[in-house]
């Protein structure tokens, strides 16, 4: 298999050989580490807020075919942090891979919480369409912008899920009307479909339960037991999500 456009030769060669290039240092203007997880940003120290109680929010990962997306493509639809204080935020990530499965979509979504919190000066809580994100004045002054959020998602997905993800494309929507349309027409139907699938299962119909420690960034001693009929206390991880990552 070959390409006629020689600008695509290296890219195609890596794809055919199954070679993946990993970014060792994130190209963002703030520090990135697990040590910042659990950082609280007070209102007085806040430059921007994306909160579902004020504006539409959603987080969604969708599996695509390899030829349907462009690797490392980043789209920003709407104003950036320097153009508005209170913003909507729809985080839409499209992934493709030979070993990717639909069950992994929600697993990747749940990781957004940790990855955003790893950024110094960023606080993230919630999931799905109930999200709150704050950006501190210090992070904004350092140069943190929406494209950096997208870079974090791309790099971390390609690093932690390299076994199943070959391509990743990120779209961030901060335009309120577009974010609301995305939430209602794209995200909510998919959330409901996942919930309906889980609703048909009972605790007695499975032979294994799972544990979740996602909230240990804020509650270090906490651990949830996840069953088909009982999610983690925060509601972020279902039994199917946990099963997909075992």
Residue map of PLM features:
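Cysteine-centered metal-binding/redox modules
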Residues: 1-246
């Amino acid at each position: 298999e070959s390409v006629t456009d020689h600008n695509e030769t290296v890219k195609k060669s890596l794809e055919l050989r199954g070679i993946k290039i990993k970014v060792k240092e994130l190209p963002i203007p703030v520090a990135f580490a697990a040590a910042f997880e659990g950082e609280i940003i007070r209102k007085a120290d806040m430059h921007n807020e994306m909160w579902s109680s004020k504006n539409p929010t959603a987080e969604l990962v969708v599996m695509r075919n390899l030829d349907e997306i462009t690797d490392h493509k980043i789209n920003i639809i709407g104003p950036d942090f320097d153009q508005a204080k209170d913003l909507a935020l729809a985080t839409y990530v499209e992934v493709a891979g030979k070993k990717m499965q639909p069950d992994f979509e929600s697993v990747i979504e749940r990781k957004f919480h940790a990855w955003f919190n790893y950024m110094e000066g960023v606080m993230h809580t919630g999931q799905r369409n109930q999200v709150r994100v704050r950006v501190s004045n210090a992070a904004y002054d350092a140069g943190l912008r929406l494209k950096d959020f997208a870079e974090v998602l791309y790099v971390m997905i390609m690093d932690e899920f390299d076994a199943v993800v070959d391509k990743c494309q990120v779209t961030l929507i901060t335009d309120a009307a577009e974010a609301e349309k995305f939430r209602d027409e794209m995200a909510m139907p998919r959330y409901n479909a996942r919930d309906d699938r889980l609703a048909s299962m009972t605790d007695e119909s499975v032979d294994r339960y799972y544990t979740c420690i996602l909230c240990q960034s804020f509650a270090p001693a906490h651990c949830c037991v996840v069953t088909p009929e009982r999610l983690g206390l925060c509601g972020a991880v279902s039994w199917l999500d946990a099963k997909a990552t075992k």
